[in-house]
Amino acid sequence: MRATTQPAPPASGTISGNAMAKRSDTTTTILFALLANGLIAVAKGVAAWLSGSTSMLAEAAHSLADCGNQGLLLLGMKRSMRPADADYPLGHGRAIYFWSFIVALMLFSMGGVFSIYEGLHKLGSGTPLANPWIAVGVLVFSVAAESASLWKAMVQVNTLRGTQSLWRWLRETRRSELLVVVGEDIAATVGLSFALLAVVATMVTGNPVYDALGSLAIGMLLIGVALFVGIEVTSLLVGQSAEPATHAAMMRFLQERDEVAEVYNLITLQNGADVVVAVKARMTERVSALALVDAINRCEHALRMEFPDVRWLFFEPDVTA
């Protein structure tokens, strides 16, 4: 079996240029979300203190958790870029999956569980809102800021998903850090809508129960998003293949190559932003060992040109499956 890496020899363990470009785009998206959530967290915290709104307090906790989460994602991306070595011969690309899972836990606990706790507490106390218009103003500002953050993330997502529906992309993407950012932004935008409706309903009716119900709804929303993200990231942690469309495209590409008579097996493994590929195939060239090696080299080069995410490539010629 032959094993090759791109573009440097295996000992270098350098990150591919295509992966670096992807991470640069995602880093910009995360920093944009971090800035938006930092401003929103401060505004929500002040509004919660002045108005006594538990929905607003739940949203402040949510935004604060989001800031911490985005910091963890940046840490995970930095760690995933460490070069390969003797202990980690395929590099540290999957480190981003671990930190994405930690983010899901943070969203579940600091966001969801805290919001439900505050909602239940408010149901028992029945404390009325003070200065509700402050809460409304901050919520309107927060919706605008979160919408801008979501728009920034969706610009990158739309370039990646092509003709896929958003739901299918969320289920099949291997970009865990982008999945987390989009999930958080969607949850934040919907959660803010819940909080705004709860505060307005409390203002109109004078009944603080609506504010408590808003906090409970936000908590359940965050827990739902956290569970979804956690399940998807767990698959990547265990060791998931490249996206189905990519795997199928690689198989078609190999089957159409003149050098390949039959593909016995194709294994792909997503390793952060890079892909590990193992191929077992029967080659058409059988004249000599040198001719066979040359045919494999041509096939490998063509595969890398067509799929630049491929960093590690193992190619085994054989005559039986």
Annotate the PLM regions.
Residues 2, 67-81, 156-166:
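Short, charged cytosolic
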Residues 2-7, 13-43:
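Topogenic membrane-insertion module of multi-pass membrane proteins
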Residues 7, 92-321:
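Alpha-helical transmembrane segments and adjacent TM-loop junctions that form the membrane-embedded core
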Residues 23-32, 61-71, 98-110, 144:
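Alpha-helical transmembrane segments of integral membrane proteins, especially early/N-terminal helices
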Residues 27, 53-56, 208, 212:
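Residues that define the loop-to-transmembrane-helix transition and helix capping
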Residues 38-46, 51, 63, 67-73, ...:
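Hydrophobic alpha-helical membrane-embedded segments
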Residues 49-78, 82, 116, 179-193:
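Acidic (Asp/Glu-rich) catalytic motifs at the cytosolic membrane interface
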Residues 76-95, 125:
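Aspartate-rich (DDxxD/NDxxD/DxxxD) Mg2+/diphosphate-binding motifs
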